[in-house]
Amino acid sequence: MEIRVANKYALGKKLGSGSFGDIYVAKDIVTMEEFAVKLESTRSKHPQLLYESKLYKILGGGIGVPKVYWYGIEGDFTIMVLDLLGPSLEDLFTLCNRKFSLKTVRMTADQMLNRIEYVHSKNFIHRDIKPDNFLIGRGKKVTLIHIIDFGLAKKYRDSRSHTSYPYKEGKNLTGTARYASINTHLGIEQSRRDDIEALGYVLMYFLRGSLPWQGLKAISKKDKYDKIMEKKISTSVEVLCRNASFEFVTYLNYCRSLRFEDRPDYTYLRRLLKDLFIREGFTYDFLFDWTCVYASEKDKKKMLENKNRFDQTADQEGRDQRNN
């Protein structure tokens, strides 16, 4: 028996599960276009789909932000229909034998930083920056990296005055411990600096293949978090970035130097990574390590055909966000 959502979308195979519900693929019964559908039980103790749908509405229209087509309650489920995307960077990392080249890390970093800056420009911080929450697109958008999962996102400043909400301590860790900033481990209220620092750990994860605080033995969740924090604090940036270009040391030291209310200099960080790109003689051709493995010949052709369009979009995106 076919299950329909909003009498418009036919529910298909299950794509995955999270702590907050399940994700399915669905087809528009008229156009046959595919979408992603998130289902959350109306009996959930910690519902978040309503909150997340509101976030997507606020972020709507941003480059690399999925579009929501329908939200509502049917039967025992709260449902959200949104763009169907490709695999996550974590999936692609595994596909590439858990190591990305410097070129791929640099091209990936550029887009991820742009997505984070856009979220910040809308007065929110993500609070769960990790490879699983960045997905490539499909078809013509196969080279475009999208940011997803805003269930843990939080407003960090007043929308009108842009005054930061107050500094607090004694907070529980929100997000993924592997990539969490040191201040997050210390229980300090998160701000923009923490998303940027988390991205730095993601980039080193991609370059190294793993992080020094992975695989630690612990008897409880709290014990594990404590051990990750201790290892993270005791591992100097220079040791963490050993065998990586000095720009990554500069990046992380900059992140750790930011004060709670500081606006990160996204342009400086982009330029830092751009200088590395130029010095290494790379070409920004949108050919990632996973391109030959994942993309079809048709998709690869589209990537090359659309290179100039994406270059122009990225330039415009940077200008737009600097005006916020």
Curated annotation (Swiss-Prot):
InterPro entries with a match to the protein in the record: CK1_Ser-Thr_kinase (IPR050235), Kinase-like_dom_sf (IPR011009), Prot_kinase_dom (IPR000719), Protein_kinase_ATP_BS (IPR017441), Ser/Thr_kinase_AS (IPR008271)
Cell wall biogenesis/degradation in keyword set: no
Active-site residues, as the UniProt record annotates them: D128 (proton acceptor)
Limits of the Protein kinase domain: 9-278
Domain of life: Eukaryota
GO molecular function annotations of the record: ATP binding; metal ion binding; protein serine kinase activity; protein serine/threonine kinase activity
Positions of ATP binding: L15, G16, S17, G18, S19, F20, G21, D22, I23, K38
Listed EC numbers: 2.7.11.1
Name of the protein in question: Casein kinase I
Organism: Plasmodium falciparum (isolate Dd2)
Gene: CK1
